[in-house]
Amino acid sequence: MNNNNIKNSKSIRVAAALSFAAVAALGTAYGGVPLNNLQGAGGIAFNPLAYTAGQPWEGGESNSLNNVVSKPQFGAWYVNLNDADINWGAFGAAFTVASRLELSAGYELVNARKYGDRSINKYNLGAKVRLLDENAFDTSWVPAIAVGGIYKYTDSRTVDALKLDNDGFDAYVVASKLITQTPWPILLSAGLLYTDEVVNVVVGHNDYDLVAFGNIDVLPASNVAIGLEYKQGARVGDGIRNHDYYDGHVAWFVNDNLTLVAAYVQTGDKDKFYRHGSAKNLGVGSGLVFSVQYQF
């Protein structure tokens, strides 16, 4: 890898400033480039970004590792859906091969004791390829573009009782762009997701649907990001429709390695199915979200 490639790899990660990245526009580098999301992939909370995870190693092209693999990064999440009495923990790890191919893994444990299932185990394996670099072709407006997929497996008595599928595969395309011409830098990211998930895979998998997702983040200070995230609810057959997901989040880039995140998420009516037998706009309630992210 030559110096230009290494600089390009860094600049792409820096461009994720407002979604928990380093901020070239303000001349200060902080951790989280991007986050490991709940499923382990490089993104924010629910959604992926077009930027790949993991920083280059020190030493530039003189370090042979930069021709092979990035540094790893890790993220841990705690989701407290208090109104539904659901506790949700997640841990993810990711790195990038050849400055372009991201590989990720994630594990999630959901305790939904109120609904009779204290141990919902979710396993995720992901890959993402950055097809187009941000500001490619010597422009200032071309977004980074990536495609990716995540294999998901859910081990749960609830899945078995509802006769849904335990595993499935999500595919997505996403574009992300940092806008620096505004008074405060703004990151815009949007994509399409082909998924069979039922309640974010907490309840398993069914038929496939194509839905949209998006993020917007603003950086009012060099070490603080404030943003919103949205994921459209998928219609996955048999009358099942997931509720749209929303969250508002604040991230503090503590230093080059550590990022702390707090958020509030709304996933939809937690009791719709149990009260009315309706499978439309299914969700698992709302609550607070906290995350610790570490990047070597």
Model-derived features with residue positions:
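Short, well-ordered secondary-structure micro-motifs
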Residues: 157-159, 200-204, 238-240, 273
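Transmembrane beta-barrel domains of Gram-negative outer membranes and organellar outer membranes
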Residues: 31-182, 194, 198, 220-224, ...
